[in-house]
Amino acid sequence: MSSGNIWKQLLEENSEQLDQSTTETYVVCCENEDSLNQFLQQCWQIDEGEKVTNLEPLGFFTKVVSRDEENLRLNVYYAKSPLDAQTLQFLGVFLRQMETSQIRWIFLLDWLLDDKRLWLRQLRNSWAALEEAQVAPFPGGAVVVVLNPSHVTQLERNTMVWNSRRLDLVHQTLRAACLNTGSALVTLDPNTAREDVMHICALLAGLPTSRPVAMLSLQSLFIPHGADSIGKICTIAPEFPVATVFDNDFVSSTFEAAIAPELTPGPRVPSDHPWLTEPTNPPSEATAWHFDLQGRLATLYRHLGDSNKAISVTQHRFHKPRSEDYAYEFELPSKHPTIRDLIRSAAADSPNDVADSIDGLMDGIVQRNVH
């Protein structure tokens, strides 16, 4: 066979790959390999041997999938979040021949990871890097995917940090960030129905979808570009500063200050696992925040026992519990009225005596477990 025929045969065999009309290009930004593999497996059903083992500095794989009885080649680049100038420079080597409108950007956030207080900063820094490199996605060209939202229930039940007001803050902040950048916002859980996953895949590709918009629950979001608005976001809290969520003041003094740092990130845990694993490294003062329930109860009972020994005193009253009694290690934000009255322990504002504080604390625990 002549060399000309060999090249002709090679071109024919790979003509599908060369046809740009049957190719879609994605850039996936994430913090963790396990998060990326979960996303790739659910959306594009990668095989075990195709799983990602390293995010740095840049990764790539290609896969042929079927959509509407047509074979489609996916070219997927992945990079560690947040994006920076160097990563975009590496990407530019591969994507410089493509129009910006041909590239779909995906930003993964994961409730199972201990970086939730940094979500907003990561999104802001990634977007700033894209704009500086003049490759920012066009409106509708990016999607923020929040993985494992069912873990929110575990956080509510097992921690003193994640109450409804903090969750509302995350809810409004993510929607505002996506509205301001022209991005879509969806949640993806391991138990998400396959039909819903297909709608998410269509949204990732920028295709129309018949799935109804869902924006009321933080655990079930499906908000295509153009479906949200400032008015809809502000139905949760009317004074929420939608337009300024990327400002330094809001990022550091409101969002990050309101969400307490968690223990040093350890291994990922499944959604049915207790909230925290044992940390691989001891937490520092800057990264640890906890509420020692057993220790607090022991202290209250000890004070109550001491007071009962003073028989000569007719009535025993104790000081009003202060915030430092509860070992808070961060200052609640106060710059925005909407955020100003984030949770304090109910006992910290109670005018009752210590015995009532114990009863109130135990009632709260029972109510949380019932719900």
UniProtKB/Swiss-Prot annotation:
It is found in: Cytoplasm, Cytoskeleton. Pfam families: DLIC (PF05783). InterPro entries: Dynein_light_int_chain. The keyword Cytoplasm applies. GO terms for cellular component: cytoplasm; dynein complex; microtubule. Keywords: Cytoplasm, Cytoskeleton, Dynein, Microtubule, Motor protein. The keyword Nucleus does not apply. Disulfide bonds: none annotated. The cytoplasmic dynein is composed of at least two heavy chains and a number of intermediate and light chains. Component of the cytoplasmic dynein which acts as a motor for the intracellular retrograde motility of vesicles and organelles along microtubules. May play an important role in the proper orientation of the mitotic spindle into the budding daughter cell yeast. Probably required for normal progression of the cell cycle. Belongs to the dynein light intermediate chain DYN3 family. This is Cytoplasmic dynein intermediate light chain DYN3. The gene is DYN3.
